[in-house]
């Protein structure tokens, strides 16, 4: 790469895209990498502020920004995603399906700490749709040493930075608990909320029963729901420390492994998550899920539908960003709620 005066560059080959920005109108390349500069191009180049310009000179120790962007893309890519066209030295990764985006934060930080290169991603554990942008990659200068890119590649030698886990068509069960519903003192308004949220993922409810505050009956119901083919079991209500609330005990008595009873998220502190020996999640949902627009359930549900096991450590990490502000206009998931680590 060689720097020379634009007015002297006729016949030379551009080594990078030249961008023109007109506020509110366009931000795009007026000339692409590889373009041979003509006399007529000089006024255009000067009008976009290019009094001096880089032209291409072969150097086997260096990589052009487009080549480097391809390497960065390769370090990120995984199944169910594809690249955009390279543009102005940048490649973006696009989702091929609906699913859960996972980001290896340690690898991402290591690569971005090397300098002269960058990878920007969406938040990990984010629900994305087919066609959504997942990440963007580029180097900062126009050229970069091959050796430096090889160092970056070594960071990802045991796996890429991104994973996109497709959602699965789940069959789920709802066990409505509480004397107040069982004895028809109040209407069950919880189950429709669960159905609506699961419908977003194409899931089908195959089992629904209502129980009084009897732990043994709820335990038996969980087992029968799984025998009926439920991939996910949701127990609604009965999650507080009141003496009549038996759901946590009932879930424990199924023999399932309790991951966490309680989560640093509001709304949703009394949330319970357990897994059976064969990996079926049993979830205890507190009453806030019924009346609050967004809760802990919205943070965990996409992971359950994608068969992405949730750990106690991950739930503990939700504390920073775990406070929903109940905004008048809800923009979730495009907000800070649930973005803790």
Where do the language-model regions lie?
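Solvent-exposed alpha-helices and their adjacent loops that cap or buttress functional pockets
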Residues: 7-11, 29, 83-86, 126-128, ...
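Short glycine/threonine-rich loop/turn motifs
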Residues: 179, 206-338
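Glycine-rich phosphate/diphosphate-binding loop of Rossmann-like nucleotide-binding domains
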Residues: 158-213, 217
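C-terminal terminal segments
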Residues: 29, 85, 100-118, 126-129, ...
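Short, low-complexity N-terminal leaders and the immediately following helix N-cap/first helix
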Residues: 1-88
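Flexible, glycine/charged-enriched surface loops at secondary-structure junctions
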Residues: 55-56, 81-86, 144-147, 204-208, ...
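Extended, charged alpha/beta regions that create polyanion-binding interfaces
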Residues: 59-167
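Residue-level recognition of short, solvent-exposed, well-ordered loop/turn junctions
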Residues: 32, 38, 123, 127-130, ...
